[in-house]
Amino acid sequence: ENHQVPEGFFDEDVFLIFQHYHALDRWEHCLDTPLTFPIPLGPFNDLYKDIEIKPISQRKYDFVFVGQVPKTGTRDSFKRGLDKLIKEKGDEFKYRIEFTDGFSKGLKPKEYMELLADSKLSLCPAGAYSMETFRFFESTLMGAIPVVDRLPKFWYYEEASFFKGAWDVLDNTLSKSLNYLQTGSCRNMLKGLAMYNNDVLNVESLASRMKHIVDQRHGNIESSSEY
């Protein structure tokens, strides 16, 4: 989860590496190399396939979060912002918050996915060591719009639907996001969410994209060998 150059990168017999938590430069952009290509984490389980996707207007919760606050400190500002929100304006929202003792130690997997499917928004703070999380993709697949404070600059976030704001103004971010979801303007976002699930997070589509990258790599090698 550290966004470093992967093991084997300097081996002469390595043709191509598809990498989760792809290497980043100092500006949190994708580190462009001829040997590596970033791919999304996707969900931690495939239970989403059997769960009904409800319309936004029929969902029980405004926002949810079930997860840990790791000792690495990556979610400290998130926890402070969330505590402040609940204390000062918690009665203005419908939510479910549960803090757990570690990764995947909260709700049962299906129960967790069903919870996401019953929420309009999903709070998606950074992981223990990376800005990226399974939660972002699980939420997207369940139709719960992710709320983030920052994301790395990878191709698979470019067309993703999400709301962005600093955790210390979480109440403002949530209010604006929920109000937006009540307007007709949100249709394009929800349509984009569905297209994202059917394209970027679709197994067959991702495999096709990876094949294209492999073919492209073959072509580059063949072209360079001619000179």
Where do the language-model regions lie?
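Conserved donor-nucleotide binding/catalytic region of nucleotide-linked donor-dependent transferases
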Residues: S175-Y196, N220-S224
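C-terminal "capping" alpha-helix adjacent to the active site of nucleotide-linked donor transferases
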Residues: G165-R187, K211-V214
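Nucleotide-sugar donor-binding catalytic core of glycosyltransferases
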Residues: E1-F163, L181, N198-S225
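Intrinsic disorder/low-complexity signature
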Residues: G42, V169, S185, A194-D199
